[in-house]
Amino acid sequence: EVYSSDLSEFIFAAAIEIIKKEKIDLMYLSTTDFIQHKAAPGDKMANDFYHMVDGYLSKLYDLGCEISFTADHGMKGKTNKDGSLNLIYMQDEVDKKFGKDECNVVCTITDPYVVHHGSFGSFVTIYLKDKSKINEVMDYIKKIDGVEMVINKEESVKKLKQPEDRIGDIVVTSNEKFAIGKKESDHDLTKLKEPLRTHGGLGETDIPIFISRKIDDSYKSKGILKNYDIFDLALNYG
């Protein structure tokens, strides 16, 4: 069941059985982020999930595994204490100012699991029909409440390491209290039973990197670590 912790637990349980039956040099396990979307740190649901994860990691360690884990992103709440949501419907905003079909807002979180996040994230990219209006559109978006960063394609390639051939003319992120969607009519909020928690902005970039053995300090020469550095750290550092 994808809308529970069961799928993640199945992954760990399967790993235990595989390790018991055959010699494995390297195993990669990937869990879902449903619990993180639904529960903040310290909530019972979150605590129960991490208790389960900790139990399986302990079993893997006892079986002789060296364990390394990280996250693909952080997660922040986008809901006020009164239950109202902090949302920016970016396509509606730019259509209102510049006219329909002048800008095409592309949301990066559009998977079918809307119970997780309602297809809201903290990052969108925008393609413009008239490239001469890029600065004008950027200046307008910067004034929208909840927006944190507005940069052009060139800046996003340099600053965020975005692929130049697959990113729009403008990149927008919201601050850690807001989420961005496309058009209000495109999002079904009835599927969200708990406060909205999602990711994609600069406020969701802090993540843990854990390795079950001590490694030497030479890794510090890498500078600020990214989650993908975990492969290098786990395999190449003693």
State where each predicted segment sits.
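His/Asp/Glu-rich, glycine-adjacent segments
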Residues: 1-40, 122, 136, 142-146, ...
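Structural motif
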Residues: 26-30, 68, 171, 210
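Short, solvent-exposed loop/turn segments at secondary-structure junctions
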Residues: 33-36, 74-76, 176-179, 215-216
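Short, solvent-exposed loop/turn segments at secondary-structure boundaries
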Residues: 39-44, 80-82, 221-223
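Metal-dependent active-site segment of extracytoplasmic phospho-/sulfohydrolases and closely related
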Residues: 48-90, 172
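Acidic/histidine-rich catalytic neighborhood
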Residues: 58, 75-125
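Active-site neighborhoods of enzymes that stabilize oxyanions during catalysis
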Residues: 108-238
